[in-house]
Amino acid sequence: MNRRILCVDDEEAILKALRLHVRKVFEMSTANSGSEGLEVFEKKGPFSVVTAEMRMPGMDEATFLAKVKELDLCVSTVLLTVDADFEFGGATALQTGKMFSILTKPCPPVRFKKTIEDGIEAYHAAKTKA
């Protein structure tokens, strides 16, 4: 079973903290920008779950996650944000199925792991149907 995840965030400290919490459970790759994330996705994929910080320099998270979905329709995408409100369209993305989940930072490790587990299950269910 593919338990590979890609986490994209411009804050190295966030990526290190995520890796610390999931290293025994998931195989995690990281990137510091949307363009780097796409490169990692194409070269090291497939990934079951891709997480992205909402406000990244360069390519925004919506563009990045849309491009990831173009490459693999089954991948579960998770948005990480410090914004508790969803004025940026996050609720709509969830409702239309374009986004698997939205997590606010700081996110408790247990919640992050559970969301990733659920995303992996959704990925494999989608792959089975495809």
Each model region followed by its residue ranges:
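C-terminal output helix
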Residues: T104-I116, I120
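Active-site residues of response regulator receiver
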Residues: E53
